[in-house]
From Swiss-Prot:
The keyword Methyltransferase does not apply. The gene is glyS. Tetramer of two alpha and two beta subunits. Its EC number is 6.1.1.14. NCBIfam families: glyS (TIGR00211). This is Glycine--tRNA ligase beta subunit. Keywords: Aminoacyl-tRNA synthetase, ATP-binding, Cytoplasm, Ligase, Nucleotide-binding, Protein biosynthesis. GO terms for cellular component: cytosol.
Length: 689
């Protein structure tokens, strides 16, 4: 099979930052899909992206489609010939649709009679000839939120396209799209290599562009940024703070990244470090520098998109830009310190949280009520919770948070400490939002845990009540994150909250017209759905989680203890046999009904059933005690000891015997066992694990 390495590059105007990686990655998957569907053998597909291009390289691409064997079933022979043995219109029409004479059709004999069959072969087309249609399909399916048109081009794209490179090894394949024809030329760096770049071969793509001051691979640029930035940070006596998201964003803004250090006035360090870091990272796309103790240093590192002839001018330019941003933040900080958080409470009455859910003040009161009730479960000081909940949203009206919304909670903590509130109350003002992302830290204080749980209960009920349930990629109120955060809080902080009654309490805080109480079970179901995702990420088999959830438990701490006991038990020697027996018991009782009568020992006839019942009676009280104490590992070990007696029972005992009394007694025995199993989980669900 002849193969080539195919390179396709779309040269564009400056792309949106997120589009660089998102469209490159999505395009690689789409190319794999369309080539596979078109029966075109191919190897690895690589994705490339810079601010001015998207590209894909397909290795070991067959130059021709795979030939296809075709078989079509036509009319029955009875319908294909008339009484004179002449071909009917049905037969002639079928032959014509296959492009052959009717005499060329085969006759196949089956159990249902004889049928006309067409067998043929469709020769694969040259991939070069198919490329325009394949390319169009990929372009149409790229996940571009907003497409634009330019000039008289018939096709829309994320940004205007200026050139199209299509190379099969070192040969240009013809393709015309976006109003431009394919060629072997790419774009070099806008400043360092303004003239077009000739790509010699699909395999020399990276090297040819690097010679033109373009690092086309995104991860290579990320690595270069990491190395350069940390090297400069070391020279400054520190270490750069390098969030992965910022590294990737800067890599998507540059084609030839060059790190440059800058400095700012030490007086700005009097502000909270989060303010400076947020300004540097989120607004200036620069990296902060910390010392070995984690203290912020008066430096930053920017990444330029070129090698400047006058690096000092570039440094001064960056310093000139960042200085007024810090000065503004310093002004906000000083102004905010003049007012206690209580002063902002009246303003919350005028701020709409959500049209149907009321003002921020109303949300504050709802959360405050729930949080104060929760103190009985979290052992948090009720007065501290009351104060923290009352002031929870006050910092949203401060000048700093109005300018930097991402600092909500953080500034609340600083302002609370400044006005002399307790450290735990201050910390809770920040912790109410924890965790802020998947895998993020949880609240550490009892007050923070309490406030965070109350906040999430209110947000989930409110979101569902206004029809804002997460769907696909849409989650405007971050309810998915809220649910996962609530799950982590309850489980990892061991808060034995019962979901249903507490969701009902939260729903009861909303005005009746909203009908929030009607959504309690929907929210509960959604939380349990996210709970399954929580365990999937920990590589716990879904069947184990489903077995526990089948008991309809409401306490996530208890559910977690059962899941974590079942997971290792399922890998034990006894588990496979035991689970199979549990499923067999479930099926027998489902078909024949459970028996609530007591087991009569005088009706136990076979040695296997006598032994099984004896084993069960010996362990039953210990099993109940272990379950009552939440010691599910011990309980499962006890149940696991029944694996062999159960095997012997099903091998030697006929449950549905002709003697009705014995039959009922055996069903009663199985009913007792099933009730015991269900003290932990519906073990029959995991029989196929």
């Amino acid at each position: 099979m002849n193969t080539v390495t195919l390179l396709i590059e779309i040269g564009t105007e400056e792309l949106p930052t997120r589009a660089v990686t998102e469209l490159a990655s999505a395009g690689a998957q789409l190319w794999d899909n369309v080539l596979t569907t078109a029966l075109i053998p191919h190897g690895e597909i690589e994705a490339f992206g810079t601010p001015r291009r998207l590209a894909w390289r397909v290795r070991q691409l067959a130059v021709k489609q795979t030939d296809q064997k075709i078989e079509r079933k036509g009319p029955s022979l009875q319908a294909a010939k008339d009484k004179n043995n002449a071909w009917t219109k049905a037969a002639l029409g079928f032959a014509a649709s296959c492009g052959v004479d009717v005499e060329q059709l085969a006759i196949e004999t089956t159990e249902k009679g004889q049928w006309l069959i067409f067998r043929g072969e469709k020769m694969g087309e040259n991939v070069a000839d198919l490329l325009p249609d394949l390319f169009a399909e990929v372009m149409d399916k790229l996940p571009i939120a907003k497409r634009m048109r330019w000039g008289d081009c018939d096709h829309a794209f994320v940004r205007p396209v200026h050139n199209l490179l299509v190379l099969a090894d070192d040969n240009v394949w013809d393709l015309e799209f976006f109003g431009v024809a394919s060629q072997h030329l790419s774009q070099g760096h806008r400043v360092h290599h303004a003239e077009p770049v000739a790509i010699r071969h699909a395999k020399t793509y990276e090297a040819d562009l690097e010679a033109a001051y373009v690092i086309v691979d995104h991860e290579t640029r990320c690595n270069r940024i990491r190395e350069q930035v940390q090297a400069l940070a070391r020279d400054l006596g520190g270490k750069a703070l390098m969030p992965e998201a910022l590294v990737k964003e800067v890599a998507s803004l540059t084609e030839w990244p060059i790190a440059i250090a800058g400095a700012f006035d030490r007086s700005f360090l009097k502000m909270p470090p989060e303010v400076l870091i947020t300004t540097m990272q989120d607004h200036q796309k620069t990296f902060a520098v910390m010392d070995t103790l984690g203290t912020l240093l008066p430096y930053f590192i920017a990444v330029a998109n070129l090698e400047s002839r006058n690096e000092e001018e570039v440094r001064k330019g960056n310093e000139k830009v960042i200085r007024p941003r810090f000065a503004d933040a310093e002004f906000f900080w000083q102004q905010d310190l003049k007012r206690p958080l209580e002063d902002y409470l009246p303003q919350l009455e005028r701020v709409i949280y959500q049209e149907k859910l009321g003002t921020l003040a109303e949300k504050t009161r709802r959360v405050q009520t729930i949080a104060c009730e929760l103190t009985a479960m979290t052992a948090a000081d009720k007065n501290s919770v009351y104060t923290a909940a009352r002031l929870a949203k006050s910092d949203l009206q401060t000048a700093m948070v109005q300018e930097f919304p991402e600092l909500q909670g953080v500034m609340g903590r600083y302002y609370a400490l400044h006005q002399g509130l307790s450290a735990e109350v201050a910390q809770a003002l920040e912790e109410q939002y924890f965790p802020t992302a998947a895998g993020d830290k949880l609240p550490q204080t009892a007050v923070g845990i309490t406030l965070s749980i109350a906040e999430k209960l209110d947000t989930l009920i409110g979101g569902f009540s206004i029809g804002a349930q997460p769907t696909g990629s849409k989650d405007p109120y971050a309810l998915r994150r809220m649910a996962i955060g609530l799950i982590r809080l309850l489980i990892e902080k061991k808060v034995p909250l019962l979901l249903t009654p507490w969701l009902e309490k939260a729903a009861g805080q909303f005005h009746d017209a909203l009908g929030a109480k009607n959504f309690v079970m929907d929210v509960r179901a959604y939380i349990l759905e996210r709970l399954q995702a929580y365990y999937r990420e920990q590589n716990i088999a879904p069947e184990i989680v489903q077995a526990v959830l089948a008991l309809n438990g409401d306490n996530l701490v208890d559910i977690d203890q059962r899941v974590r006991a079942l997971a290792p038990f399922s890998n034990s020697d006894a588990a496979l046999s035991f689970f199979a027996s549990a499923k067999r018991i479930r099926n027998i009782l489902k078909k024949n009904g459970t028996q609530q009568t007591a087991v009569r020992t005088d009706l136990l006839q076979e040695s296997a059933e006598k032994h099984l019942w004896q084993q069960w009676e010996q362990m039953h009280n210990a099993l109940l005690a272990a379950v009552s104490a939440g010691n599910y590992e011990t309980a499962l070990q006890q149940l696991g000891s029944l694996a062999e007696p159960l095997e012997a029972f099903f091998a030697q005992v006929m449950v549905m015997t002709e003697n009705p009394d014995v039959q009922i007694n055996r069903l009663a025995l199985l009913t007792a066992l099933q009730k015991g199993f269900e003290l932990i989980a519906d073990l029959s669900i995991i029989s196929n694990l």
